[in-house]
Structure formats: structure tokens, C-alpha cells
A protein has these predicted regions:
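Basic/aromatic DNA-contact patch characteristic of tyrosine site-specific recombinases
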Residues: 1-75, 79-91, 96-103, 128-131, ...
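C-terminal secondary-structure termini that scaffold catalytic or DNA-interacting sites
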Residues: 1-4, 238, 251-275, 281, ...
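Short, basic (Lys/Arg/His-rich) helix/loop patches that form interaction surfaces
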Residues: 9-10, 139-144, 201-207, 219, ...
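Catalytic-site neighborhood detector that most strongly recognizes the C-terminal catalytic loop/helix
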Residues: 48, 183-187, 191, 246-247, ...
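Short, Lys/Arg-enriched alpha-helical recognition elements, typified by the DNA-recognition helix
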Residues: 56, 73-166, 178-181, 301-304, ...
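Basic, Lys/Arg- and aromatic-enriched nucleic-acid-binding interface segment
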Residues: 142-148, 152-154, 165-231, 236-237, ...
Length: 396
């Protein structure tokens, strides 16, 4: 049975305030109209005193009048992030990027914040998540926390999802905006100098994957791009290769080929005569393997670097092969370090930064300069020393 209410005179700018039969006060304000029925939509407030209700109305009325009021959503963080991930992100992201986002959402974000209503999510909630993950946030069972870089990636996902919610009027401000991220220390880049590169190549020559290692060292090409390379991507007459796809592993799908992540990653790389010669020799050897395999060989994939049946080489398996070669050579470098080795040697040989940036597929020359700042600083010092020594010799 509904309770009767006692109407009182409406105060200036209060909206509507009434006193209930049980003694409590009730306030309401018109916030809009139902688009389907045309009926009024009102927001109700309750309090023990008239002033308590009046104060609540005073806060909301200006927002209603200026069109900035948003009715708090009842959707939870878990519900919204799941919707955002599958409805908004999946159609536009590369499979590997989407999989990475899903891992962050399901592994880190929902377990910590999923129970909260989206409208209740505050900066402090998100900041506590970052702080906790920094101390003990690993999901692989190992001790210790996540790196500042990993925290920044989680932040990117959270900020993006909340920004979409803000655009849709589900929240007024993005609470991730005011969080403070841990400082990222620039890691020292490990690469091979010219002498070490020579040792690596001498050792790698014993491997059947020598052509792949030689190409990587001469171009700075990424692992996935290397393993996704097709013969049709190599122009022996123009002495160039074109990066059109990469090989990646996606959970639930296995190994797949996908387009480069950016337009700049889809690039043309010039090849030196020595590289072309190694590739020609590799192709001749591959043709022999293909003849032995017969119809079992997957020639349709047209892969430059494939297994004995023409199928893709698993990126992780390829990395393990590389690591064994490095160990035999007595060196300490990752496969990605070959990319840094190429860039460093190119810089030291006087190749301009713009050319290196385009070859590596970096988004800007400034980024390339930032990544190799320690190398360029060393080069500048050496140049200054050479000029200084030359000028000093003139006054002796």
C-alpha cells in the first residue's frame, strides 16, 4: 500500500519537495523525458530533514539546467569492460592486440575492480590497483610485481574503456585521468658491436637458419615480420623486400598471419648485394627440400623461412634456436637485440636517422633518436673529440 505524502510550498529553485507520511522528506527534479513514451523522468532524493533534501537538489539542478547531468548507471565495471572489449574493440583491433587487451581486462582489471558499479569507480580505486600490481601483481606465479611499463599498459586499457563510457554519458569524468603512474626507467639496450656481430654470424653459419639471422641483422626486421615473409615480397631486381604481413600466435587460433600493426610497419626495405646472395642460396636449398617433400610441401604459403613441409616456423621455437646459437657464440643478446644491433651499426656508419626510422618502421625519427639516445650521445662525443683534436693539432 503506497504512503500518502503531504505537499508543501515549493521553495525557489528547489524542484519539488514533499514530506512523507513517515516523517522523511522527499525531493524530485525533472531530468528529461522517456524517448519512447514521452513521460517525464524524475530523479528522487530522500532525507531526514527538508534542508538535507534541499541541499541535494541544489547540487543537481544546475547540472540538469545546463545539460551536464548524467543519471548514474547501475552497470558494473566488469559488465562495461566486457562490453567495451567485445563490442567496441574487437572489430577494430588486430587479433594479437585484442588478445592482449583481453588478458589485461580478465587477468588484472575485473578481479580487482569488477564488482564496483561503474558510476562508483573513483581515482583512488584505480590508483590502489596500480600500486598493488607494482608490488605483487604477476599472474605467472613468480614473485614480485609488474614493471612500470606493464602498469602503463593496464592504464592504457582502463583509460580507453572509461573514456568511451564518458562519451556515452555513463560517467561524467574519467577517474583514470588523475592517477599517477610509476616512473619508467629507460632500460639499457643490449646489442652487438661489429666484432660481436662477426662472431655471431660465424657461429650462425652452422645453422640451417643462417639466412634468417643474416637478414634480421642486416635489416632490423621484427621476428614476426621475418617469419611471415614470402618470396613474392622480395624483389631481387629492385634489391628490396616489402613487409606485408607478420606471423603471430593467437590464443584459440594458433599461428596466423596478420597485417602490420601500423602503416609505417608496412614498409619497403632496401637489401644489400650480400643479403640478396644469401637469400638466393637459401632459395636453392629450399627448392631441394621442396622436391623431396613432394605434394606434402605447402607451396601455397610461399614462405621464405619455413619448416621442411613449407609450414610456418613457430616464433617461440625460432627464438629458442636463436638462443642456442647465441649461447654457442658466448654472447648475450636477444633476438630483438639484432634489431638494435642493426640500428646502432647503421648510426655509427653515418646512416641518417630518417632512413633508419623508415627501415625499422618507427613512427617518427624523434622516437628513433630517443630509443638510441645513448648511442647518438656517444657518437656526438666522439665527433667533438675528433674535431677538437684536429683543431688542437693546428696550433701546435
Amino acid at each position: 500500500m503506497s504512503k500518502k505524502v503531504k505537499k508543501t510550498r515549493r521553495g525557489h529553485g528547489e524542484g519539488s519537495i514533499t514530506q512523507r507520511k513517515d516523517g522523511r522528506w522527499q525531493g524530485s527534479v525533472l531530468i528529461g523525458y522517456d524517448p519512447e513514451t514521452g513521460r517525464q523522468k524524475r530523479k528522487y532524493f530522500y532525507g531526514k530533514t527538508r534542508k538535507e533534501v534541499q541541499d541535494k537538489l541544489i547540487k543537481i539542478i544546475p547540472k540538469v539546467q545546463t545539460g551536464t547531468y548524467r543519471e548514474p548507471t547501475k552497470i558494473t565495471v566488469a559488465e562495461w569492460f566486457t562490453t567495451w572489449l567485445n563490442v567496441y574493440m574487437k572489430p577494430s583491433l588486430r587479433p594479437t592486440t585484442w588478445e592482449s587487451y583481453r588478458y589485461q581486462v580478465e587477468g588484472h582489471i575485473i578481479p580487482a575492480l569488477g564488482h564496483l558499479r561503474l558510476a562508483q569507480l573513483q581515482t583512488a580505486h584505480i590508483q590502489r590497483l596500480y600500486n598493488k600490481k607494482l608490488k605483487s601483481g604477476r599472474l605467472d606465479g613468480r614473485k614480485g610485481g609488474l614493471s612500470p611499463r606493464s602498469i602503463k599498459y593496464i592504464h592504457t586499457v582502463i583509460h580507453s574503456a572509461l573514456e568511451q563510457a564518458k562519451k556515452e554519458g555513463m560517467i561524467i569524468i574519467n577517474p583514470a585521468e588523475a592517477t599517477k603512474l610509476p616512473k619508467q626507467e629507460q632500460k639499457e639496450i643490449k646489442y652487438l658491436d661489429a666484432a660481436e656481430a662477426a662472431i655471431f654470424l660465424a657461429t650462425a653459419k652452422e645453422s640451417k637458419h643462417f639466412a634468417a639471422f643474416f637478414l634480421a641483422l642486416n635489416t632490423g626486421i621484427r621476428r614476426g615480420e621475418l617469419l611471415g615473409l614470402r618470396w613474392q615480397d622480395i624483389d631481387f631486381k629492385a634489391c628490396q623486400l616489402t613487409v606485408n604481413q607478420g606471423l603471430v600466435r593467437v590464443t584459440g587460433k594458433g599461428l596466423i598471419f596478420q597485417e602490420p600493426k601500423t602503416k609505417l610497419s608496412n614498409r619497403v626495405i632496401n637489401l644489400a648485394p650480400a643479403v640478396l646472395q644469401v637469400l638466393k642460396e637459401h632459395k636453392a636449398e629450399q627448392n631441394e627440400i621442396r622436391l623431396l617433400a613432394g605434394s606434402a610441401y605447402n607451396a601455397d604459403l610461399d614462405l621464405v623461412f619455413a619448416n621442411e613441409l613449407g609450414e610456418p616456423i613457430c616464433p617461440r621455437a625460432f627464438t629458442r634456436i636463436f638462443e642456442r646459437v647465441v649461447k654457442r657464440a658466448g654472447l648475450d643478446v636477444t633476438f630483438h637485440g639484432l634489431r638494435h644491433t642493426f640500428a646502432t651499426i647503421a648510426l655509427e656508419q653515418g646512416v641518417d636517422v630518417k632512413t633508419i626510422q623508415e627501415t625499422l618502421g618507427h613512427h617518427s625519427a624523434a622516437f628513433t633518436m630517443d630509443v638510441y639516445s645513448s648511442v647518438t650521445a656517444k657518437m656526438k662525443k666522439e665527433a667533438a673529440d675528433r674535431v677538437g683534436n684536429l683543431l688542437a693539432s693546428l696550433i701546435e
